Amino acid sequence: MKLRKYFPSTKTFSFSCFVLLLFVSNFANAKGKDSIINFIFTSDVHFGLTKDYFRGKENVSARDVDMAMMQVMNNLYTSKLPADKGVLENKVIGGIDALVITGDIANRMEKGVQTATASWKQFQEVFIDSNRLHKANGTKSELLVVPGNHDMSNAIGFHRPMEPKKDPASMIGIYNLMFPNSKVSSFDSSLHRIHYSRDINGVHFIFLSLYPDSAERVWMEKDLKNISITTPVFLFAHSIPDVEPRFFENPNGIHDINEEDRFENLVPERYKDAKDLKGETTIEQNGFVHFLQQHPNIKVYFHGHENWTEYYTYSGPSKNTKLICIRTDSPMKGRISFKDEKKLAFELVTMNTHSGVLTVREVLWNAQDGVSSFNWGLMANYSLK
């Protein structure tokens, strides 16, 4: 049998190239669709507090304020993003991958504030039972929560009187929510560390217990061993990066929580800069900065605690690092929104993981009279490559 060489005609060759280009184009578009991350970020929901004034009413409970915010979140996916040169500008949001809340679920139980048990039940009602958020594929959005200083103090005690003296309900609730296969009925801060990670569309999310102190960094080091240096990493914690001395373990005496020293023992690391709260946190922050220098793929730090919207850069005590920081408002204790309810805000974070562009948009969720209407506020674009 004689073999013949096959030489495709010009028409056949052109058609084949067209099919190949169409396939490559469709594949690229499919990958592009998968490269988008959308998540909502809020913090300091403080169940147990009341708001002096909200939507024409006085002394409005956190349950009602937070429920109003949740209603706006639930309808956000149908909204069109503004023409602001950000990721997905002028396009419908379409889906929310996750709702992230960085702590202070329950307010500290001082001066007649309700118990953490009551606050956790209200949290479940608002952010679990009334949560209708879903991803672009129709599946339910993840709810990702870490504790704040109020949650931890309710569980371990405080240097001022509380009633009751301890109630770990929100710490137990957060732990069981995030570790459903290892549920607990009591809480021990030395055993039940609330830290975990998630991989979402090519980004590694790390969720921390209050602050990345030396103990958290040991766990983070192990977690990051499985992550490529080219994978962007986001950190989520309650505390500001320039952490306050009171968060650390009391360096004095038997290292307990007491009225004289007023350290809160919120993280395991013992305070080193001084013996009282008048000191700095230079040593503690430098430990974190060194960790950042060892892991340059840590790109963004999300936090609450100080309760206003700000997108800024953390430089460290020696001005030798540059970490993008996203600070968010509190629906109950906002430094700005407390006086002007139209400034109440949460953040919508959108990233294209192929281009490496991250867009953060402030959602002014109470700026209009409609119960589910909002205005866009601050906006920032970051290139993470």
Residue map of PLM features:
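N-terminal active-site segment of His-dependent metallophosphoesterases
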Residues: 28-115
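Short, solvent-exposed loop/turn elements at domain surfaces
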Residues: 37-39, 47-53, 215-219, 334-338, ...
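His/acidic metal-ligating clusters that form di-metal
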Residues: 32, 71-95, 135-139, 185-192, ...
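Active-site-proximal beta-strand elements of phosphoester/diester hydrolases
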Residues: 36-52, 202-211, 236, 323-330, ...
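Bacterial N-terminal signal peptides
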Residues: 14-25
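Active-site glycine-centered loops adjacent to acidic/histidine catalytic or metal-binding residues
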Residues: 44, 103-104, 148-149, 238, ...
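Extended active-site neighborhood of metal-dependent phosphoesterases/phosphodiesterases
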Residues: 109-221, 225-232, 258-270, 311-333, ...
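Bacterial N-terminal signal peptides that target proteins for export
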Residues: 2-16
